Regions:
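Active-site-proximal specificity loops/subdomain of glycosyltransferases
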Residues: 1-15
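Conserved catalytic core of nucleotide-sugar-dependent glycosyltransferases
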Residues: 17, 25-106, 118
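Generic surface-pattern signal
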Residues: 10, 77-80, 84, 155, ...
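C-terminal catalytic/acceptor-binding lobe
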Residues: 92, 98, 103-206
Length: 206
């Protein structure tokens, strides 16, 4: 991840925002633009789906994450100044996104948790309750938020979600909220997943 952000800054040094995603990630670009419009690109921002390994908090790479230009410059400069130390740490680690997150922290760039907008899985596997079966905080109810990204998406899922988003954009105001139509699509996918894997979904009323 660190070589990637280093190369990205040198090849595209004048962007306001940098969006990093994996091959099986999916981004709803229309809602990403709305999300970015709520942030200040002149500030050092590193945001995504929160993950934790040991004491290191970081943005999950598969869920995609965003970095402002000031934040990217800070972390690249820090990486250049501490390259040997960071690469030694990397050699003993298994998660490149965690190494990147630790480097942001060490460089003085705080992590911003962008969950539930950035999701760790695809719609049919989005959890409605926590692992202990207690309901999520009402302010963080998954179906009351606007999605930006998903992970573990197959090629067929990506195509279906892309078609859904483009159809929605064609039929609606570009700046309106995807939420109601998204629910229909997501609930359909959730039902498919239940049939496919024989699972039950514990969903709060919409």
């Amino acid at each position: 991840f660190l070589p990637m952000v280093n190369k990205t800054l040198h090849e595209r040094p004048d962007m306001k925002w940098y969006v990093f995603m994996e091959a099986d990630s999916f981004i709803l670009w229309s809602t990403l633009q709305q999300y970015l419009a709520t942030l200040d690109p002149t500030k050092a921002i590193y945001a995504g789906k929160q993950m934790l390994i040991a004491n290191d908090m970081f943005a999950h790479g598969g869920s995609a994450f965003i970095v402002s230009r000031p934040a990217l410059r800070i972390v690249v400069d820090y990486y250049s100044a501490h390259k040997a130390e960071i690469e030694k740490f990397t050699d003993g680690h298994w998660a490149g996104d965690c190494v990147l997150g630790k480097t942001f922290t060490d460089a003085g760039v705080p992590f911003t948790n962008a969950w539930p907008a950035f999701q760790v899985d695809y719609p049919g596997l989005v959890q409605y309750t926590r692992a202990d079966a207690r309901p999520n905080n009402q302010k963080l109810r998954l179906w009351c938020g606007t999605p930006v990204s998903y992970h573990h998406m197959s090629a067929a899922m990506v195509e279906e979600m892309w078609d859904f988003e483009q159809d929605w954009i064609d039929r609606n105001d570009p700046v309106s909220n995807l939420r109601s139509q998204y629910r229909k699509c997501s609930l359909t996918e959730s039902q498919r997943s239940q049939r496919r894997y024989g699972t039950k979904t514990f969903s709060p009323p919409l």
